[in-house]
Amino acid sequence: ISIEEESIPKIIDEIPILSIAASFAEGETSITGAGELRFKESDRLMAIEEGLNKLGVSYKSSDDSIVIMGNRDLNISKEVNIDSFGDHRIAMSFLIAGLRFDSEVYLNDCKNIDTSFPSFFETFSSLGADIKTT
């Protein structure tokens, strides 16, 4: 899958969750011309890279692009702690990723989720997520 620069403005807020989906997809997903992600609520490209790295996802990145090598069998064997950098879309995306793993995935700084999805935790729990807040 290739997401090109001309599509980025239309789907800028979906890039974090698309990156998660790409992590479990077969083959490579290329997202190019996405430099404006570095200037959203957080540096979203950096936050995506850091989170994917902690989950063991293979990827290559540059200043304005990321290529994610999907792995349908991706799993983690130990607890992982991911920083959302106060970005609600990063937090929701990596919480959703956590549903796919046998081990615990912890997200720091999730209080901003209410910004875009006030009932996220209720909805997420109804899908089987075991959520603990501190």
Positions of the model-derived regions?
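Short, structured segments at the rim of ligand-binding sites
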Residues: I1-T134
